[in-house]
A protein has these predicted regions:
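Bacterial Sec-dependent N-terminal signal peptides
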Residues: 1-22, 191
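Non-catalytic cap/lid and distal C-terminal segments of serine-dependent acyl enzymes
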Residues: 20-344, 348-381
């Protein structure tokens, strides 16, 4: 079912991609080679906006799948549009040369070192100077190319914030080195590991790495693991990329009931901080300030009431005045804040302001009027 869905998405969107996709030969000084690369630029690209950059190895196999999912999620799920580059590696089995590692050390072989520099010092800088890219940069690879992405984690600052690693053919000791590095790196990282149903030594190493990654309890490390027992080396790509793409941009989705129960209600921090951190992270990673969802406002309001965290109502009220001007939202929440503090006069004046403004969501003028009448009765105004 999932596979058919994403195949449909691929067909739907790839039919109209011609004008947005270009293929060219990239002259690499580092490799001393001419490499085939393919670019996807959103059709409504604007130099005034910032776009996450996605680097896709095994471009012949993965590029179209990644583009289709990017278009689908940006159109229907509100995730940001992305700039995508695919590096072709099929001819002459270049992928095995580009991503080769030494069997004894597990580190890149000579050609691998040059390919590492080609991506990091030539291809990516070219795209970042040509287009207005966001700080958020993603790596997508499969098998040997998936393993190669891990090497960027060992730089002082990783070139990539996000990794979609599909059935990686892990170099020696990588199942231990990657978790150890992710546990110590001072950087927000999104890591999605995917494995199919193949039974081999690689699978055992992947499952060992998964166990170690799941044990990391650290702010800023976002890890997901998906296993598809019936998938083979071909279908795993179709199964895996769609779900992984959604998880990479999960912060763009409205706060879900599960998130509300498991993350917000259980947190010992002020409720408003959760909302503030969410939107600050989006701005830091993606380079723009996302409009606050009304759903998220209501989730934080409900949690503030449930946890008797009335201090969170004050900053929430100020945010609502900015995001939803002209509506009751900000002044109504502020009125409840003063009401909780026992400041009757301030609360009454604030509810009067709310009464004069437009209704929104569950808030009605009748509710503001009831608050005003109750305050007058309680405080004898």
């Amino acid at each position: 079912m999932i596979r058919n869905f994403f195949l449909f998405a691929s067909i739907l969107f790839c039919t109209g991609l011609k004008a947005q996709i270009t293929q060219e030969i990239f002259e690499s000084f580092k490799l001393q080679e001419r490499r085939d690369v393919k670019y996807y630029i959103p059709e409504d690209y604007s130099p005034e906006k910032k776009y996450p950059l996605v680097v896709v190895l095994d471009g012949e196999y993965l590029f179209d799948q990644v583009v289709a999912n990017s278009k689908f999620y940006s159109t229907f799920q509100g995730t940001p549009e992305t700039i995508i580059v695919g590096v072709f590696q099929k001819e002459n089995d270049l992928r095995w040369e580009d991503c080769a590692f030494e069997e004894d050390s597990g580190l890149p072989a000579e050609k691998g070192k040059l390919f590492f520099e080609f991506l990091g010092m030539e291809l990516i800088p070219y795209l970042k100077t040509t287009y207005n890219t966001a700080p958020f940069t993603m790596f997508v690879g499969y098998d040997i190319t998936a393993n190669f992405g891990n090497y960027y984690l060992f730089k002082e600052k990783s070139l990539f914030n996000a990794f979609i690693s599909i059935s990686p053919y892990l170099a020696p000791e990588m199942e231990n080195r990657v978790p150890a590095r992710l546990n110590e790196i001072n950087q927000q990282i999104f890591y999605h590991l995917i494995v199919g149903g193949e039974k081999n030594d690689s699978r055992n190493a992947i499952l060992q790495m998964d166990k170690a990654l799941k044990s990391i309890d650290k702010v800023g490390f976002n890890y997901r693991f998906d296993e598809y027992p019936t998938a083979n080396e071909v279908s795993i790509v179709t199964y895996g990329i769609g779900k992984a793409w959604g998880s990479m941009f999960e912060m763009f989705k409205p706060i879900s009931p599960k998130e509300y129960k498991e993350n917000i209600l259980t947190s010992e921090e002020p409720v408003y901080k959760y909302l503030d951190d969410k939107y600050n992270s989006i701005e830091e990673l993606f380079g723009f300030r996302k409009e606050v969802e009304l759903n998220d406002i209501m989730a934080i309001y409900a949690a503030s009431r449930k946890k008797d965290d009335f201090e969170s109502l004050k900053p929430l009220a100020e945010l609502c005045k900015e995001e939803f001007p002209g509506t009751m939202l900000g002044f109504y929440f502020e009125g409840e804040y003063y009401e909780a503090l026992g400041e009757g006069k301030k609360a009454l004046r604030t509810f009067e302001k709310a009464f004069a403004m437009e209704e929104i969501d569950f808030l009605t003028k009748e509710m503001a009027l009831e608050k005003m009448d109750a305050l007058k009765a309680d405080f004898g105004f």
